Amino acid sequence: MGQKTNPTGFRLAVRRNWQSRWYATKKDFPKLLEEDQIIREKLMEKLKQASVPRIFIERASNRVRVKIYTARPGIVIGRKGQEIEKIKEELAKLTGKEILLDIQEVKKPEIEAQLVAENVALQLERRIAFRRAMKKAVEMAMTLGAEGIRIQCSGRLGGADIARREWQRKGRVPLHTLRENIDYGFSEAHTVYGKIGVKCWICKKESDNN
């Protein structure tokens, strides 16, 4: 039986780059890896409203450069840059290192797989019908120039007693072709019936690779 691998990990060094880019000795590696995870968790928690699909981290000696991709840069930067300065201070206190923040705007959030998955999960939490939420996301992505999209919801859909899996697809989503630009996102909806997992695969055009 065929199993799906993570499209991001599958395409590393072919179509995708690592989200943490630094070198460390065997002794320091676990500590820095844990630090990266703490930075990401802190930022994702703080910037929940800013639509952040991914965060890149680079290191050089005692300096950490954090590149935040966001659909709403105004929320991250804040009035007169107040928010960004607060974030810098918090991360510097957390890591004990100099923090450099780089904010990159996501031009088309409707074709960012992580943001699409989070949006569908949010709608499920607001008790919107799962088929309607998926259909709307699929149509929006195709309208904005995606080559193809597939969205899958798993769990007690519609409050059913037995958990099941349903999906919708439009266009082409060739998961086995390494040269294709496949974006992948995952989110969870916390409903009164339990968790519902939302997965999203989007096949993008070359021009949409940001």
UniProtKB/Swiss-Prot annotation:
The keyword S-adenosyl-L-methionine does not apply. Keywords: Ribonucleoprotein, Ribosomal protein, RNA-binding, rRNA-binding. It comes from the Bacteria. One of its GO terms (biological process) is translation. InterPro entries: KH_dom, KH_dom-like_a/b, KH_dom_type_2, KH_sf_prok-type, Ribosomal_S3_C_sf, Ribosomal_uS3_bac-typ, Ribosomal_uS3_C, Ribosomal_uS3_CS. Residues 39-107 form the KH type-2 domain. GO terms for molecular function: mRNA binding; rRNA binding; structural constituent of ribosome. One of its GO terms (cellular component) is cytosolic small ribosomal subunit. Disulfide bonds: none annotated. The keyword RNA-binding applies. Pfam families: KH_2, Ribosomal_S3_C. Binds the lower part of the 30S subunit head. Binds mRNA in the 70S ribosome, positioning it for translation. Belongs to the universal ribosomal protein uS3 family. Part of the 30S ribosomal subunit. Forms a tight complex with proteins S10 and S14. This is Small ribosomal subunit protein uS3. It comes from Opitutus terrae (strain DSM 11246 / JCM 15787 / PB90-1).
